[in-house]
């Protein structure tokens, strides 16, 4: 069963189809595991270190490449007006937001951590999804919950370190 509608864009034009499919499969599995509503949407973009660096600089004031960035539509930022989802009809799908992954950073980290690129891409995708769902790791207690759930999902899928 397909829970998520994923709008996937590979800006690198280099990511093998099997890697894209793996990430989509992991996100679908995670969505079912986390009991996300059927028909929920998100966008997933694969980019380069330079591409994610530009986004990181523009939106987070950090002039460096990172592995994954998530933009949650359901999260309120400073000065933003809360969306009243009750105004929309029941046919309007839930849109979680955007996950952006640097494939170059994923390859670097896979080598550093001694596991496969597939495992790293899966980890980053689930990490991004959890951010879209409101999980964070700014505080030690939040980190414990988020990273524990991340490991639980990846282990249940069979993508262990």
UniProtKB/Swiss-Prot annotation:
EC main group: hydrolase
Organism domain of life: Bacteria
Amino-acid positions noted as binding Zn(2+) in the UniProt annotation, renumbered to this chain: 127, 131, 137
GO cellular component: cytoplasm
Signal peptide: none
Needed co-factor(s): Zn(2+)
Major site of localization recorded for this protein: cytoplasm
Listed GO biological process terms: rRNA processing
EC number: 3.1.-.-
Cofactor remark: Binds 1 zinc ion.
Gene3D superfamilies per record: Metalloproteases ('zincins'), catalytic domain
Subcellular location: Cytoplasm
GO molecular function: metalloendopeptidase activity; RNA endonuclease activity; zinc ion binding
Keywords carried by this UniProt record: Cytoplasm, Endonuclease, Hydrolase, Metal-binding, Nuclease, Ribosome biogenesis, rRNA processing, Zinc
Record function comment: Single strand-specific metallo-endoribonuclease involved in late-stage 70S ribosome quality control and in maturation of the 3' terminus of the 16S rRNA.
Similarity remark: Belongs to the endoribonuclease YbeY family.
The protein's name in its UniProt record: Endoribonuclease YbeY
Organism of this sequence: Listeria monocytogenes serotype 4a (strain HCC23)
